[in-house]
Curated annotation (Swiss-Prot):
Hydrolase recorded as keyword: yes
One Gene Ontology molecular-function label: urease activity
GO BP, one annotated term: urea catabolic process
Major subcellular location class: cytoplasm
Any one Pfam family match given in the protein's UniProt record, by short name: Urease_gamma
InterPro entries, per the entry: Urease_gamma, Urease_gamma/gamma-beta_su, Urease_gamma_sf, Urease_subunit
Family: Belongs to the urease gamma subunit family.
UniProt keyword annotations, A-Z: Cytoplasm, Hydrolase, Virulence
Enzyme class: hydrolase
Protein name: Urease subunit gamma
Assembly information from the UniProt record: Probable heterotrimer of UreA (gamma), UreB (beta) and UreC (alpha) subunits. Three heterotrimers associate to form the active enzyme. The trimeric urease interacts with an accessory complex composed of UreD, UreF and UreG, which is required for the assembly of the nickel containing metallocenter of UreC. The UreE protein may also play a direct role in nickel transfer to the urease apoprotein.
Length: 100
């Protein structure tokens, strides 16, 4: 199977998101890379489901709470930007202060 660099990046991000999801299900608090991966994954899946950029920007702030991540992580993540493919092309989705 031949994958482009972009496809490899998406696959790696999705895998990291799955790891984060499993750790969260076990009751573990997520670290910085896990939190970013989970939020990014949720945004990419939402785009795939046909949600709009505005919906994703709003929903991106509800993926995680401060209680679900390690101390200091919410302050470290100022914004998360994910390039997603929509029916009308590729767009950049930005979520500012994603963990409240």
């Amino acid at each position: 199977m031949e994958l482009t660099p972009r496809e490899k990046d998406k696959l790696l991000l999705f895998t990291a998101g799955l790891v984060a999801e499993r750790r969260l299900a076990k009751g573990l608090k997520l670290n910085y890379p896990e939190a970013v991966a989970l939020i990014s994954c949720a945004i990419m899946e939402g785009a795939r489901e046909g949600k709009t950029v505005a919906q994703l920007m709003s929903e991106g702030r509800t993926v995680l709470t401060a209680e679900q991540v390690m101390e200091g992580v919410p302050e470290m993540i100022k914004d998360v930007q994910v390039e997603c493919t929509f029916p009308d092309g590729t767009k950049l989705v930005s979520i500012h202060s994603p963990i409240v």
